[in-house]
């Protein structure tokens, strides 16, 4: 991130840190750029990521990811992938890790979204935890599949935790998605 600040004049600021729970939690994070993948390591406490298992086979990157003890899933696995997130997510939470989930399942171009996957919310419900929605405008400065970076300040906004206990999982997901996408609209650079 330091190199991006110096070479590309691309800085960032985080808003809403007061919303971070005191204990390990599940974060639902907007995925629109490669930037947030790098930045989340500095922004959030000790963490593990739910990611596509193919990334583990990329030389050097896979080795680095292995150190984070990721929950590497086969995205085509459906229910099996959800079970992996539940089982491994519970274990990582017990070890004190925060579980980072990109609920769209892949990077989405700015202005686009898709139905959020359920595994993050189901894990939160299984552990009686809230989900923490997080959005940012990095996609405006470092677009998906783009190497050119625009100078500016990326804004990361951490939202209030969303309770999951006693709430229909789909309703929690819809609320998180609505907060993430609506807040993102307010972050468009001028």
Indicate residue ranges for each PLM-predicted region.
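Secondary-structure boundary/capping positions in well-ordered alpha/beta enzyme cores
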Residues: 10-11, 46-47, 71, 96, ...
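Non-catalytic C-terminal accessory region of glycerolipid acyltransferases
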Residues: 82-190
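N-terminal membrane-anchoring alpha-helices
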Residues: 1-13
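A generic structural signal for well-ordered alpha-helical segments
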Residues: 4-5, 65, 92, 124
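Generic preference for hydrophobic
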Residues: 14, 27, 49-50, 156-158
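Glycine-rich helix-loop-beta junction characteristic of Rossmann-like nucleotide cofactor-binding loops
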Residues: 16-20
């Amino acid at each position: 991130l330091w190199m991006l600040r110096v070479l590309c004049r691309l800085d960032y600021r985080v808003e809403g840190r007061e919303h971070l729970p005191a204990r390990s939690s599940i974060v639902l994070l907007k995925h629109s750029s490669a930037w947030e993948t790098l930045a989340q390591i500095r922004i959030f406490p000790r963490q593990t990521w739910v990611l596509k298992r193919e990334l583990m086979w990329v030389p050097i990157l896979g080795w680095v990811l292995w150190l984070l003890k990721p929950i590497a899933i086969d995205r085509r696995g459906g229910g099996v992938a959800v079970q992996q997130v539940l089982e491994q997510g519970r274990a990582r939470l017990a070890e004190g890790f925060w579980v980072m989930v990109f609920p769209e399942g892949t990077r989405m171009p700015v202005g686009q979204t898709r139905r959020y996957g359920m595994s993050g919310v189901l894990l939160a419900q299984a552990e009686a935890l809230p989900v923490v929605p997080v959005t940012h405008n990095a996609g405006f400065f470092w677009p998906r599949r783009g190497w050119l970076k625009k100078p500016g300040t990326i804004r990361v906004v951490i939202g209030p935790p969303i309770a999951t206990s006693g709430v229909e999982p789909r309703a929690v997901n819809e609320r998180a998605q609505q907060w993430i996408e609506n807040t993102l609209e307010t972050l468009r650079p001028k």
